[in-house]
Amino acid sequence: MCGRYSLFAPPEAVEQRFDATFDEPFQPRYNAAPRQSLPVVGDDRDGEIRTMEWGLVPPWADSREDGGFINARAETVADKPSFRDAFRQDGPGGRCLVLADGFYEWVESEGGKQPYRVTLADDRPFAMAVLWTPFEPA
C-alpha cells in the first residue's frame, strides 16, 4: 500500500459511492499519513463510514509505537504473525476498506523525490483493502 493518500471529494460523493454515511463530520485529507484517524467502511456492512487509526499494531505490541505496519505482501500475509489473525479473521480484527480519491507515488528526480498523485480517470472515490486489529497493550 502507498505511504500517503488523499480523500477530499465532497462527502456526499463519498457516501453515494460506498452506500454509507459518515458517523462523524467528514474532514478532507490532502496528505493522509500513517497514525492518523482516517475513514473506512467495515466488513460488517452496517452502512457507516467510521474512522480508524492507519497502521496495524501487532497483537504482542506494548504500545502503538511498536507497530504501525502499513504494507503486507500478498505472498506472506496469511503466514506472518503480524497479519495472520486479521487476514484469516481468527479472533479480533479483520478486513475493511480505507476510502480514498488518490494516492501518491514518489519518483526520483535530480532535485530529490517528486510526489505524483494517482487518481481514477473520472476522479471518483475508490477503496483500498486493509487489515485491522484492535489495539490492546500486551
How should each PLM-predicted stretch be described?
Residues 1-138:
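Short linear sequence motif anchored by a di-proline
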